Amino acid sequence: CCEDPVEMMPTIGRHLADLAAAALEGALAIARTEVAEGLGPGLAAPRRGEAVDALDLAIIGMGKCGARELNYISDVDVVYVVAPVEPAATPNAGTEGESAPLKLTENECSTIGTELVHALTRAIMGPAPEPALWEVDANLRPEGKDGPLVRTVESYVQYYKRWAENWEFQALLKARPIAGSAQLGARYARAIDPFVWESAARESFVES
């Protein structure tokens, strides 16, 4: 056992980040159930449960969480990515007696994804007999507090192409998929990777 607390910090940081990721995974499962059953405010649809199942959501760790350097007083910085689940090709899909697989529009993805994020946040941070697990902070997302809580990969790409500032590219250095859809998280990581390294050629990148 290491006797020096300072030497232990990298290991502790990794374990805390992994614990936060597991908590977010659990909170997302709770959120999916709540939203599907109509327990939260907002979305109302005849096929509500099916709509929730038709949405992929990935949680991207940022800052200390993304870098696996979390400490006991850190916020858990995240951004959220959504996408419609691609309906599986089945022989009977859409035939008489079989309902067609639900394919969500981008607006529907945004609506349902936002509901899921609100429910997830309540599960982790809401008042309860036990203290909140973590302060989950999504303010590193594009446009900060003024921006939408969830975006598609394509929406993130357009933002980073057109409007992102140098510090936002620097923040992406620590971005890491930590919960939710692993496939969607990997797609987000592949999409933003070029921006991280190409941004070094931008004017005043080092000074910022």
Where are these regions (language model features)?
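A nucleotide- and high-energy phosphate-metabolite-utilizing enzyme signature
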Residues: 1-208
